[in-house]
Amino acid sequence: MKIISNILLTLSLILAGLAHAETPEKKMITVGAQWKIGPSTAYWIVAKEKGFFENLGFEVNIVGIMGSQANLSALQSGQVDLASPQAFTLAKARAEGFKAKMIMCYVPKPQLGVVYHRGRGIKSPLDLEGKTLGIVAGSGEALLLPMFAKVNGVSVEKIKVTQLSYGVLNGMFFEGKLDAMTTFMPYLPRFLSDGHKVAAFQYEDYGIYFNGITGTEKFLKENPITVRRFVRATQKAFDWIYENQKEAVDIFYKVQPELISDDHQADYDQFKLVMSTQYDDISRKKGVGWMNDSKWKKTFKFTEDNFDSKINFSTSDIYTNEFLRQ
């Protein structure tokens, strides 16, 4: 009996130890979305409303943050535990000494492109030569323009590029003062719904990463269970959303009815464009969020070419797949 009692005691201690080992380190985490909460970030709201973040052992608070640099600033200041910067913005910050890693890239392809007026002789990208194109200097869509031009045999020097602010760009375009503009592609269905006679060229996958869940090295090291549970729940959520896009849109607008447009089909089309960039060749094989060295090295080159940054670190210093489903 004494032997059995000792065995049972040992087993209970082992089980207790295992249970303790799997206890999340945090009671709540705050996660920054890459933009304000709206159609382009609807999947975060849907994931929460659908229950993917329940039973994790901690609360998940999603906040909208306007842009990549603001995401990094919030992460650096501790306003959020995890953020969603663009990969090249993160690489620039890492080159400047900020130690953080991307742990799930959920935008591995650009959500950007060129929108143009129909009836102005633009049928292919080559027709942009000689036309007036509005851009916001330093924006992702502007930085990718040379790649888009090169792939399509277009000379950027032959395009009449006009640099404007976001506050002015759309107005000038829809007033007809510009032939085309670089923009966030999911806006296109809304433009069409509003009656604008426009079309677009969407940027292709140029081999660089965009937005992804990112944490400081310190936070990732101190909270591995919390991070792993959140990331894997997010993977499951994104997979479900991708397969159930109409239901996902309905869930989002039930929570945010003030954002619904008069043309609900445009809402569906907008979300479809957002979700079309969630998977690349790597993530289709391995799962949403997965990254590899090759694409990160191209992201490094893009960063050096556009941000006057010197990449003095390895790919293992800026990303990891360890928290993803294996």
Spans of features found by a protein language model:
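Bacterial N-terminal signal peptides
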Residues: N6-A16
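Sec/Tat signal peptide C-region and signal peptidase I cleavage site
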Residues: G17-A21
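Short, glycine-/small- and polar/acidic-enriched structural segments
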Residues: T23-E175, D179-M185, H196-F201, G207
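Periplasmic-binding protein-like
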Residues: Y106-Y116, L192-N223, V227, V231, ...
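Phosphate/pyrophosphate-binding betaalpha-module
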Residues: P189
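Secondary-structure end/capping motifs
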Residues: E222-N306
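Conserved C-terminal helix/tail region of periplasmic/extracytoplasmic solute-binding proteins
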Residues: D293-Q326
